[in-house]
Amino acid sequence: MINVLLVDDHELVRTGIRRILDDIRGFKVIGEAKNGYKAVQFSRQHAPNIVLMDMNMPGMGGLEATKKICRYCPDVKIIVLTVNCEDPFPSKVMQIGAHGFLTKGAGSDEMVRAIRCVHAGQRYI
C-alpha cells in the first residue's frame, strides 16, 4: 500500500486528486493539508510514503515545507505539483529534496505513474 498525503490550499484540487487515487488499487490517501505547516506536522506524525505538494500556498509554502520534510522525515518522498513548469523551477525543487515534479495539468495516468516511480526509488520529471 502506498500511503499518500495531499497538500494544496484549494480543497477542490485535494478532492479531485483524492477521487483519482481512491480508485487505484494499492493507493491510500491518509491525509490532507491546506498549507506547508500542516504538511510538515502531518508528515512528522504519520510518515506518509508520498507527499503530493503544491508550491503556492499561504503561510508556509511548498518550497519551505519540502525542505523541512526532507530534513525531519528523510524516508518521505515528495512530488511537487505546480503550474510553474519553466526552468529553472523543476531543477530547483529537485535540488532541495523533491523526488518528482508534475504540472497540475498532468492527467491521472501520469500522476499514478509518477507516484509509482517515486515510491520505487526513482525520480520523476
PLM regions: where:
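Short hydrophobic/Thr-rich beta-strand motif most characteristic of the beta2 strand and flanking loop
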Residues: 26-34, 42
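Conserved acidic segment of CheY-like receiver
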Residues: 1-13, 17-21
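Receiver (REC) domain active-site loop signature in two-component systems and cognate sites
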Residues: 57
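Acidic catalytic/metal-coordinating carboxylates
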Residues: 35-38, 61-64
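C-terminal output helix
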Residues: 88, 106-119, 123
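Active-site beta3 strand of CheY-like receiver
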Residues: 46-52
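Active-site residues of response regulator receiver
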Residues: 8, 54, 82
